[in-house]
Each structure stands twice: as structure tokens, then as C-alpha cells.
Amino acid sequence: MQTYGNPDVTYGWWAGNSGVTNRSGKFIAAHAAHTGLIAFWAGAFTLFELARFDPSVPMGHQPLIALPHLATLGIGFDEAGTFVGGTTVTAIAIVHLVLSMVYGAGGLLHSLTFPGDMQDSEVLQARKFKLEWDNPDNQTFILGHHLIFLGVANIQFVEWARIHGIWDAAAGSIRQVEYNLNLSSIWNHQFDFLTINNLEDVMGGHAFLAFFMITGGAFHIATKQVGEYTKFKGSGLLSAEAILSWSLAGIGWMAIVAAFWCATNTTVYPVDFFGEVLDLKFGIAPYWVDTVDLPNGAHTSRAWLTNVHYFLGFFYIQGHLWHALRAMGFDFKRVSSAVSNIGTASVTLND
């Protein structure tokens, strides 16, 4: 974290990142605990939505988030899209709750029992995951493993669609989808992905990403930088705060893209489960409104997802700018100091 040259800086309790900045063991513990929180939310919220779900009302016209995503995966609904009971959905929710306890226990184990810094571990492979923020070889090694996990997740999604099947809005049923690995089509969808209208291309994009990420991950793990680590290559810029800022930029950008995609696309976000497409409005900030008449105070699943993603993405981007400026050495305390001194400041003109 940025210290502005103070070697004995003290952070407040709210600066949670400061406690794990140079302690890779605690960093892993925080990751595991965070995963547990996400799994707990997924399981608990699925049960909450299942208790409120009304089969007589279109799913897209109910304030639901988890159930529509399960429905698009063909879980809890038959091939015609009819709700077939909550047994499978309940089982998935409970599995997530159990996993949340496992992840939470893993976080406690890493935090209380294992070394706070992986560099002190007795396991050789574990020591490779020590944190050296200004060492590109160390950072690229860790990045490579992240990319491989993301690639494997893409493979799981593609294979689920190919073997089990997912909801096809055009056919109005669940069907198996073979990915279209046409590189020309994938390349062109970089510019019109918001209007993609067939599942084969969607799966093809995920299959390409799986190959790209796993290959890139292996490359980052196996290779080291060529030549001297100079300022031109980023020496002096690579730091914990800089990497945090880039992470916030990435997740913020993805959230905003997801908002636009959810608002307009009915192939990935079917009308059956998410409701009708939205209209973009402008007030103090951009926002999306429903195009269908609903009871007072009610909104479609699409409206909830779109607006939440957009505003979260907006604030993530603000966090990116904040931490990026700090990483570059900008001291925000000087701003408040300058503002407070405006009334007493004087200007002297030299002859």
C-alpha cells in the first residue's frame, strides 16, 4: 500500500488490504474467506428466492436473481421451461451453504495455523506463491494460475451446454449446444457482442477463451521477463496498490459491460426468465427502466440485474482511479490541506 515515504505508517481498521499486503498467507486466507461469503450468499439467496417464487407469475416479472440463472442452465425446470419443483434447486443451495463453511474453515486455517507469509512455509511449492509486488516474474507466475482456473471454468460451462443443455430462447426449450469455433465469427463479435443471437456463437466464444486463458496461463507460469526490468517496462510502477487498481478497473469494466448486455440481449438473458428488454434513461446518472407495466413498486429481474451491475461497476471504476492515483504517488491529503488553506493563502508578486 502507498505510504508516501513513511516507513512507520499506521492504517485504520477499515483499510483491510493493508493487513495482507506483504503477507501472502493472510492474503490466501482472505481469498478463501471471501469465497465462503460468496458461496453463502448464493446458497442463502437461492433458498430465499425459492420461498418467494410464485409459479403463476412469469419468472422475469418477479424480483429474482439466482433462480433465473439456474433456469437458463436448465436446472429446476424441464425441457419446456416448466417449474418442476424445488428439490434440485434446494440441493444446489445447500451444497453452496456447506461449501461456504468449508471455505470459511479454510480461511481460518490459513489465518490462524499456517504461516502468515508463504515465504516461511516448509513446502517448496507454497513458497513460490510469496508476494513480491515489484517482481514481475513473481506476479506473472501467480497471474498464470489465475488464468488457468478461469479457463477451466469456461470449459465447464461449454461442456455443460454440450452435454446437459441450456435454455434456448429461440426454441423455447432446453437443448444441447455445440460450440461454434469459427475464429472469424468470434473476432467479429468483439464489436457486436451485445447483439449476439445464437448460443453456438456464445459457446464458441467461451471455448476460445478457455483455450486462450489456459495457454496464456501456462505461458505466464513457464516464462520469465527478457532483459533488464527497466522503467520502460514498468519498474517503479508495479506495486500492491497498482495491482489493486487494475483489478478494480477489470471488475468495473466487466460489470458495466454486463449491464449493457443484460439490458438488451435476449439470447443470453431470455425474456422468459429475466423479463422484457429495458430502456436507457438519463438523470443524475444513466439508469434503465422496464418497458412492461408491472404492479406499483415491482421490477423485472432484468431491471434489478442491469442497474445493480452498472452502479457497482461505476463505483469500482472510481476505486480504480483512487488507487491508481495513490500508486502513482498522488497524496489526497494535500487536496484537503490546500482547500483548508485557501482562506489564509497569500500571493506575493516579485518586482
Swiss-Prot record:
An example Gene Ontology molecular-function term: chlorophyll binding
GO biological process, one term: photosynthetic electron transport chain
Transmembrane segments: 27-47, 64-84, 89-109, 202-222, 242-262, 305-325
Cofactor(s) it depends on: divinyl chlorophyll a; divinyl chlorophyll b
Induction field: This transcript is moderately expressed between 4.5 and 72 umol blue light/m2/s. The whole antenna complex is most highly expressed under low light; as the light levels increase antenna complex levels decrease. Thus at least in this strain the amount of antenna complex is controlled mostly at a post-transcriptional level. Transcription decreases upon iron starvation.
UniProt subcellular location: Cellular thylakoid membrane
Protein name in UniProt: Divinyl chlorophyll a/b light-harvesting protein PcbA
Species of origin: Prochlorococcus marinus (strain SARG / CCMP1375 / SS120)
